[in-house]
Amino acid sequence: MMKILMVSWEYPPVVIGGLGRHVHHLATELVAAGHDVVVLSRRPTGTDPLSHPTTDEVAEGVRVIAAAEDPHEFAFGTDMMAWVLAMGHAMVRAGLVLNDWRPDVVHAHDWLVAHPAIALAQFFDVPLVSTIHATEAGRHSGWVSGRVSRQVHG
């Protein structure tokens, strides 16, 4: 039996594409196989910590921690990287509630959660596994605006 911390930008009820569905299926199958799984994800976009606080619940045998958007009062507009980094910071803070539960491995699902996954793997001093499910170009049918492309690809 392994203790697995999955970090994902999407997990039900936040499902934008296939990522949330994949992580949900993988998490529930790992629980069915006898593993202890925690998924760290986020609350819906555009919500605030007062109306949508960070939650810590168990669903289908999977402990799901969904971080409140932080800082919710910032209007990031088209600054995708600022939003991703701010949300990553919120996810790290939410993940620190696990100090009584130490994973054997952290599994990052996609580049969007690289920051919180790396930070938590280092905090717990455990290996990090990363699956890059898509690129931004792939998510946008091969077209990414100049600003977003420059932010993501440098």
Model-derived regions, located:
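Short glycine-enriched, charge-decorated loop/helix-capping segments at active-site entrances
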Residues: 20-21, 80-81, 143-148
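Structural motif
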Residues: 3, 104-105
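A conserved catalytic-core segment of Leloir-type glycosyltransferases
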Residues: 35-103
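Histidine-centered beta-alpha loop that forms part of the nucleotide-sugar donor binding/catalytic region
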Residues: 9, 132-135
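Nucleotide-sugar donor phosphate/pyrophosphate-binding loop at the beta->alpha transition
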Residues: 126-129, 137-154
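N-terminal subdomain of nucleotide-sugar transferases
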Residues: 1-63
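Short His-centered aromatic/hydrophobic patch
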Residues: 108-113, 132
